[in-house]
């Protein structure tokens, strides 16, 4: 982990992009068309995935989102592109000083994304998302090991892909200390998103289901250092 970067659970309070309204319409349409199966596991899982897509777009600016949702999805529920160079207020100032050309994280050395942006060599990050609509259990290390395996099955374990891909795990619950430890042991950029379960009100409208906390593992923190993601979504550090 770069000097001065300390892992912290972050609470989000930032603004939402206007285009989130389009996803709200998709969610409402999905609920309306599936009113007969509101209690089914499949319905709730799909509803949560759609909710996560909305938050990815509205809060983080992830685009080209695609719900895989097949029986053979390889453990990846959503894919997308994250062009941080194109998000207002995120890309570094061209005159910003002390942007290293490489940093060490564990046994690996990588080029920070902000350096690539300044060099003109950055391309949108590939985003691979796994959704876990858990209702009770906190998120432990096992799920991150499974995510690591899903990344390998997706055919992206080479160094080139690793440094241009961000893995995200989304769940309504908090991380355990074991979950945090395992996350930081894995030399892959991993972000944990705590996104609440959407709630269907008596009138059929949707409530809740918002991005509440955001956590980068050590590798992701090194890759994204200085990209001002915290500024984008309005983050406040919470003790782990």
Swiss-Prot record:
Keywords: Mitochondrion. One of its GO terms (cellular component) is mitochondrion. It holds the Pfam family RRG7. The keyword Mitochondrion applies. The keyword Isomerase does not apply. It is found in: Mitochondrion. InterPro entries: RRG7. Its main location: mitochondrion. Belongs to the RRG7 family. This is Required for respiratory growth protein 7, mitochondrial. It comes from Eremothecium gossypii (strain ATCC 10895 / CBS 109.51 / FGSC 9923 / NRRL Y-1056).
């Amino acid at each position: 982990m770069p000097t001065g970067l300390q892992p912290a659970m972050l609470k989000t309070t930032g603004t939402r992009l206007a285009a989130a309204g389009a996803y709200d319409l998709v969610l409402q349409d999905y609920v309306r068309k599936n009113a007969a199966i509101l209690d089914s596991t499949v319905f709730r899982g799909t509803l949560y995935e759609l909710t996560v897509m909305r938050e990815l777009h509205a809060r983080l600016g992830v685009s080209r989102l695609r719900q895989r949702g097949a029986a053979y999805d390889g453990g990846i529920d959503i894919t997308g592109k994250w062009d941080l160079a194109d998000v207002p207020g995120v890309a570094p100032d061209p005159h910003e000083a002390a942007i290293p050309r490489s940093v060490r994280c564990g046994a690996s050395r990588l080029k920070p994304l902000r350096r690539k942006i300044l060099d003109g060599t950055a391309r949108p990050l590939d985003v691979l998302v796994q959704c876990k609509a858990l209702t009770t259990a906190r998120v432990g290390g096992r799920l991150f090991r499974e995510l690591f395996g899903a990344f390998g099955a997706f055919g992206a374990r080479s160094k080139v892909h690793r440094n241009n891909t961000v893995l995200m795990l989304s769940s309504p619950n908090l991380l355990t200390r074991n979950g945090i430890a395992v996350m930081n042991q894995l030399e892959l950029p991993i972000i944990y998103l705590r996104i609440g379960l959407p709630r269907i009100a008596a009138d059929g409208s949707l409530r809740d289901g918002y991005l509440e906390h955001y956590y980068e593992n050590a590798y992701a923190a090194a890759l994204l250092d200085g990209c001002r993601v915290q500024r984008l979504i309005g983050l406040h550090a919470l003790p782990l």
